[in-house]
Amino acid sequence: MKETRGDGGSAPFCTRLNHSYPGMWAPEARGNLTRPPGPGEDCGSVSVAFPITMLITGFVGNALAMLLVSRSYRRRESKRKKSFLLCIGWLALTDLVGQLLTSPVVILVYLSKQRWEQLDPSGRLCTFFGLTMTVFGLSSLFIASAMAVERALAIRAPHWYASHMKTRATRAVLLGVWLAVLAFALLPVLGVGQYTIQWPGTWCFISTGRGDNGTSSSHNWGNLFFASTFAFLGLLALAITFTCNLATIKALVSRCRAKAAASQSSAQWGRITTETAIQLMGIMCVLSVCWSPLLIMMLKMIFNQTSVEHCKTDTGKQKECNFFLIAVRLASLNQILDPWVYLLLRKILLRKFCQVIHENNEQKDEIQRENRNVSHSGQHEEARDSEKSKTIPGLFSILLQADPGARPYQQ
């Protein structure tokens, strides 16, 4: 196995703890906490409250999502509807396990007030941490892609979905995603790529540089291959998710227009389409904000043949190094936001938001109809009262019989 420490037992990049906690992505701890920081060493205030808060927040959200999915899964009679629940449950489990494997290490390093090299002289902890970040980071992205594909098939090809998309197939796909990502993350253990200590010397991740002068050419190209493959795989997962979600939204809008033309519960379908589109767009926004900065900056550093390891000696790169650290922290937020975006906020926030939108739209439409045809104002009033008396359905509640989320989750 290749050496996993960034620079052996040399001095840390930053001798003070950084004040921010990037979730599962950074065991931020450094000692000497007592001496004043030197030039370029001021990394912020020290507080163990950040990793503890992130751990509690992520644990509560993902555990609650798993509980709701478990209860809903047992109630489902249709096997086709269980596929969507399996995807959400697997995503919550992935995020939760990722936090439980890394956050305790973060807190331990915080409390120990020691350098990374002192806690991990062999480099094995660095390898474990980098491998864990890679596995659970890519797994979350590709599980989100699998969910997007599943939704698109349920909406655009309901008959094929009903006959081919079984619960067993869903389990096989999810397990295959996890095993494939694990095999990829093990490449540095086999000598292809490297997990190294990153700026400010408080976390381990994939090396994007060519290594030291003494490293071999094959080793350098192995680092570049592994890092670039990780970035391209992440961008591929985002592209799949975006494409499938946009296709789903387009299909829903087309179906809503068809229902409106046929006068088949057009108001109800309009609410469902709006609610669904808001959630899918929210998913895309969260994934973009959380992952795009990290993946794009990794590719930029690979093409420029640089890495955050140069921050130790080049103080002129502090802005770039700090931006990379922010990008890592944004990526770590994804595992905390996932259960809320996919499940929990669906009933808490989306329905109220859609109610406000449709009430405003109905008022505008009513005014326009009354201006066009005053003689039928009485009929318009009855139609408006009838629409208000209806209960707004949950997300994916009457989209298709093959839709896996056909009714809102009940608590």
From Swiss-Prot:
Disulfide-linked positions: 126-204
InterPro entries listed in its UniProt record: EP3_rcpt_2, GPCR_Rhodpsn, GPCR_Rhodpsn_7TM, Prostanoid_rcpt, Prostglndn_DP_rcpt, Prostglndn_EP3_rcpt
GO CC term (a single one): plasma membrane
Annotated glycosylation sites: 18, 32, 213
Region (Disordered): 367-392
PROSITE patterns found in the cross-reference section: G_PROTEIN_RECEP_F1_2
Amino acid composition bias (Basic and acidic residues), ranges on this chain: 367-390
Entry keyword set: Cell membrane, Disulfide bond, G-protein coupled receptor, Glycoprotein, Membrane, Receptor, Transducer, Transmembrane, Transmembrane helix
Top-level taxonomic group: Eukaryota
Main location, first listed in the record: membrane
Biological process annotations from GO: adenylate cyclase-activating G protein-coupled receptor signaling pathway; inflammatory response; intestine smooth muscle contraction; negative regulation of gastric acid secretion; phospholipase C-activating G protein-coupled receptor signaling pathway; positive regulation of cytosolic calcium ion concentration
Gene3D superfamilies: Rhodopsin 7-helix transmembrane proteins
Membrane topology, as annotated: Multi-pass membrane protein
One Pfam family, short name: 7tm_1
Residues in the Cytoplasmic compartment per record: 75-87, 150-171, 250-279, 346-411
Family to which this protein belongs: Belongs to the G-protein coupled receptor 1 family.
Assembly information from the UniProt record: Interacts (via C-terminus) with MKLN1.
Protein role: Receptor for prostaglandin E2 (PGE2). Required for normal development of fever in response to pyrinogens, including IL1B, prostaglandin E2 and bacterial lipopolysaccharide (LPS). Required for normal potentiation of platelet aggregation by prostaglandin E2, and thus plays a role in the regulation of blood coagulation. Required for increased HCO3(-) secretion in the duodenum in response to mucosal acidification, and thereby contributes to the protection of the mucosa against acid-induced ulceration. Not required for normal kidney function, normal urine volume and osmolality.
Protein name (record): Prostaglandin E2 receptor EP3 subtype
Native organism: Oryctolagus cuniculus
Gene this chain is encoded by: PTGER3
